[in-house]
């Protein structure tokens, strides 16, 4: 028997596949749940940013589970209405990239993923929370400051014109060799409660094991089941070193261990929080993102929030976890 009894299926009608095809897929997903005795409501999002409110409304009306059907953007929006609630959240990949679904080992086929979810179990997990630009949002995948967010900004703008995933790769190559990296001070509270101050050129706070896709082999030690953020800090702008590390990450050969060094190019830190203090004159030069969604300008505070979400995960999900340590490596 499924762990849930009344479910809301939320999907974005203007994202990915044609509306008619998407509606057909949603109907088939609903039928899979209904055959297992689940009461189902399938609902399109009303507008950009409405998914969180729709999730809250459904929970207040008796839904014990809400499923984000779509890509990373849909999951992010639904999450804002699910955080700190007691209802279960599930994800169903639908036509576009879905990093959380990949981390949960859900198949990319929407209908098969729905069938998998019937055997998933609810598990209370921690969430990341980011405060920037006067707003607070939750995330499940990653959040950060720096060139990777700039890449999202430029690639999204280019994709609107070209409509291809190659936008990300072409923009990434350009940024790697042309972008002027902006250093910013960071204040970290480690998992052990130690206060650390340093300077970074790039910061990513991860929660999932990997991003999937071309970076599926890059697993710096983060975990949905941990109560920590896994911080990845770049502290050296040597472009030859960055290119080498990028190639190593793509092939699964990137180092994640080594001796502690003050001049280390890359640091991996398990943390409870991190504050990125950016001088006002440089704030406009630094982009901020959470789960692939561009947010307001720095300064930014990122922290872990324990016991924040009931997520449907595979019944035997020990592979989601992993040891977390504080390490630095020179590239």
Can you annotate each of these PLM segments?
Residues 1-66, 76, 111-112, 318, ...:
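ATP/NTP phosphate-donor binding region
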Residues 14, 27, 35-36, 45, ...:
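Catalytic core of DAGKc-family lipid kinases
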Residues 20, 191-192, 223-226, 233-331:
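ATP/nucleoside-binding phosphotransfer catalytic cores, i.e., glycine-rich phosphate-binding loops
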Residues 68-72:
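N-terminal glycine-rich "phosphate-gripper" loop used for MgATP/nucleotide binding
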Residues 74-87:
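Short Gly/Thr/Asp-enriched flexible loops that form oxyanion-binding sites at enzyme active sites
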Residues 144, 148, 204-221, 293-294:
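Glycine-rich phosphate/pyrophosphate-binding beta-alpha loops
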Residues 159-169, 211-214, 219-241:
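Gly/Ser/Thr-rich active-site loops/lids in small-molecule metabolic enzymes
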Residues 182-184, 199-201, 225-230, 270-272:
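A generic structural signal for short beta-strands and their flanking turns/coil linkers
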């Amino acid at each position: 028997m499924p762990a849930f009894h009344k479910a809301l299926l939320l999907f974005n009608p203007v994202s990915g596949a044609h509306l008619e095809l998407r509606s057909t897929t949603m109907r088939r997903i609903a039928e899979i749940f209904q055959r297992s005795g689940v009461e189902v409501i399938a609902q399109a999002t009303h507008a950009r940013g409405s998914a969180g409110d729709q999730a809250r409304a459904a929970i207040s009306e008796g839904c014990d589970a809400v499923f984000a059907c779509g890509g990373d953007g849909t999951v992010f929006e639904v999450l804002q209405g699910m955080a700190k609630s007691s209802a279960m959240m599930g994800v169903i990949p639908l036509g576009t990239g879905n990093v959380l679904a990949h981390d949960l080992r859900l198949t990319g086929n929407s209908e098969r993923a729905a069938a998998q979810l019937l055997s998933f179990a609810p598990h209370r997990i921690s969430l990341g929370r980011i405060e920037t630009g006067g707003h607070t949002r939750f995330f499940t995948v990653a959040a950060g400051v720096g060139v990777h967010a700039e890449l999202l900004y430029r690639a999204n703008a280019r994709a609107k014109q070209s409509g291809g995933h190659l936008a990300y790769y072409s923009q990434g190559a350009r940024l790697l060799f042309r972008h002027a990296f902006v250093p910013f001070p960071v204040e970290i509270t480690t998992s052990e409660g130690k206060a650390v101050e340093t300077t970074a050129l790039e910061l990513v706070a991860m929660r999932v094991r990997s991003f999937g896709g071309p970076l599926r082999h890059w697993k710096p030690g983060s975990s949905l089941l941990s109560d920590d953020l896994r911080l990845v800090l770049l502290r050296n702008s040597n472009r030859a070193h960055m290119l080498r590390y990028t190639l190593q990450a793509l092939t699964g050969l990137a180092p994640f261990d080594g001796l502690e060094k003050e001049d280390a190019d890359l640091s991996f830190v398990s943390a409870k929080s991190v504050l990125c203090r950016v001088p006002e004159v440089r704030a406009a030069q630094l982009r901020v993102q959470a789960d692939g969604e561009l947010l307001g300008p720095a300064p930014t505070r990122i922290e872990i929030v324990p016991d924040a979400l009931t997520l449907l995960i595979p019944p035997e999900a020990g592979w989601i976890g992993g040891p977390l340590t504080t390490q630095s490596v020179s590239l």
